Amino acid sequence: TLTTKLHGGYVKSLEDRDRIFNEQLNKTGAEYFDYYLLHAIGRDMYENKYLKFDCFNWLREKKRLGLVKHIGFSFHDSAAVLDRILTEQPDMEFVQLQLNFLDWESEGVQSRLCYEVACKHGVPVIVMEPVKGGSLVNLPSEADAILRSLGDGSNASYAIRFAASFDNVCMVLSGMGSMEMVRDNISYMKDFKPLTPEEMGGVKRVADVFRSQNLISCTACNYCTERCPKNIPIPAYFAC
């Protein structure tokens, strides 16, 4: 499966859309992409980039031509904004959401609310940030003890299985930096079993520990460092 995206930050004219797309085809040597998404949509990006430059209709045309098999977008905003977009763009085939057990009830990320909006519109969800940039793997001792009491699964396994336990989730993206991580992911996803009620209760208790300790909710996506005028490695300081 081959997937890539159109980043609105690089689109400054109608011509940029095809230029970027053709460069992506040339660099990959592919004839088409299985999944193609409009990247990091929120209200501002939706209105000032993707609508302004007619990117949804452009993407539909790529699908009509057979250059893209499935079209959708990744999303970072409120459930209300997502509802508006899916109402205005009803033929989107997937939406990529930040979904993990820490952000599930977050007032800022609104994972649960956004998931419910996708369900309402019948749009499958692809999950990003299931381990929240590693935050749900490298746990505080109190939280780690909770997961250890559930069994011998890795911390990542509980986080990724949480994300994959919802009926409308069609795919979970997992950033893997070693063969050990690949093997670990395969071990519990090959013959997947959703979290049991006991395990679901355990990960919710882990989320409570995070909230009680006022830990900084950072995914280490580094978007902030790209915009920092002093080039401060902000996620690295948060991780200290």
What does each model-identified segment do?
Residues 1-4:
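N-terminal glycine-rich cofactor-binding segment that shapes the pocket for flavin-like pterin cofactors
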Residues 91, 113-240:
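Structured C-terminal cap/extension of enzyme domains
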